């Protein structure tokens, strides 16, 4: 087993048998920067959310999930500190996008809105204040950059 990748909040280990282990840490990442402070058990919460969606959508889209049960992990990952943080997955080719669901007028979306510009193909007819809840959430994908910053893209770009 070897470390395959170290991301902003996850560590990926290659079991060299067609499977990988992903460990979700308590690191905080904002605007593509890892912050020096950690949030206790943040990794467990992120992992639980990801596991929920992998399970919920498994009949809609295939995914890499094999198990999140600690007893199914290789011995090195069956320690208490890995409980709730690990998933065992199939080693597949990654589709290099992430999908962001935005429910509030904030960040780069708010900056574009203030200038009267559409945000990744989304136009807003209503007047919004910064951090105000949107009438309907919007989906804004971005690239999943191996290095450097992720880049916002449109759904059409992904097709």
Give short role names for the model-derived ranges:
Residues 1-142:
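Active-site loop/lid in soluble adenylation, ligation, and acyl-transfer enzymes
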Residues 133-159:
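A short mid-domain helix/strand-loop element embedded in enzyme catalytic domains
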């Amino acid at each position: 087993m070897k470390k395959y990748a170290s991301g902003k909040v996850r560590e990926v280990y290659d079991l060299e048998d067609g499977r990988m282990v992903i460990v979700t840490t308590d690191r905080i990442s904002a605007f593509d920067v890892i912050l020096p402070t950690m949030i206790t058990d943040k990794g467990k919460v992120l992992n639980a959310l990801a596991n929920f969606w992998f399970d919920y959508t498994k009949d809609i889209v295939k995914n890499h999930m094999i198990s999140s049960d600690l007893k199914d992990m290789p011995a090195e990952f069956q320690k208490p500190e890995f409980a709730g943080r690990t998933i065992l997955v199939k080693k597949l080719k990654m589709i290099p996008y992430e999908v962001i669901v935005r429910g509030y007028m904030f960040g780069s979306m708010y900056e574009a809105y203030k200038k009267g510009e559409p945000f990744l193909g989304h136009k807003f007819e209503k007047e919004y204040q910064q951090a105000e809840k949107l009438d309907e959430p919007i989906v804004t994908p971005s690239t999943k950059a191996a290095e450097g910053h992720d880049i916002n893209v449109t759904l059409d770009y992904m097709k």
